[in-house]
Amino acid sequence: VQDFANCARMARRAGYDGVEIMGSEGYLLHTFTAPRTNRRRDHYGGAFVNRIRLPLEIVREIRRTCGRDFLIIYRISLLDLVEGGMEWEETVQFA
């Protein structure tokens, strides 16, 4: 979480208006949100609220670190298109 926030802080210092976090298409954060790939048995796995915990922690820490005027774009997959992926209802709730 802190590494994401540190990268965002460096982007802000370099003059960028915001960052885009890749949470789609099989990237690391997508593997946390998709039931098919998230087989964790801790507070980051299982129930939907647990599977979205890491992305939410990251976004909140970037917001805390960089301020309300810093743009944060979080890219999600609309539909996983694989058996066992995030369902439409979960995707809408996550968005």
What positions do the PLM features span?
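Flavin-dependent oxidoreductase catalytic cores
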Residues: 1-95
